[in-house]
Amino acid sequence: MTNKFASAADRDRRASNAYTRGRDLYWTISLGMISNLVTLAIISSIDDTPALAISAVLIATLVFVLVSSFDCMDDLKAIASDMDDEESSTKLGAKLLGAPWYLFKGLLVISFGAMTVTVSYTHLTLP
């Protein structure tokens, strides 16, 4: 099978892009978690927090994390699918090609979605 993306420069470019998008994914999830933890700290430390504003921040964080993370994952999947036979036969190549991307996306939706829904619901319904 001939692959037009098999030169050494293409391999270096793929590795660089994968590193960059992996770092972007890491920082997106980290910022989302930090934002949610800070929001929880604000809610617990201030008695009269504006419920609607807090919910808006949580929803904006959810949207940012999901859109950015899904884009990073799609890029990583595309980078993996561009590997030539030699790269894809390595352990790392096989791991990238067999990664359960939909499972990762589902976990993000469940975890950040659950945080957003539960904190917003609790904060909006408390007296």
Locations of regions flagged by a protein language model:
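Final/C-terminal transmembrane alpha-helix of multipass membrane proteins
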Residues: 100-121
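Helical transmembrane-bundle signal
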Residues: 36, 61-68, 112-119
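Membrane-associated alpha-helix detector
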Residues: 2-65
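Conserved small/polar residues in nucleotide/adenosyl-binding loops
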Residues: 122-127
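Membrane-water interface of transmembrane alpha-helices
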Residues: 67-83
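Short membrane-interface loop/juxtamembrane segments of multi-pass integral membrane proteins
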Residues: 14, 18, 82-101
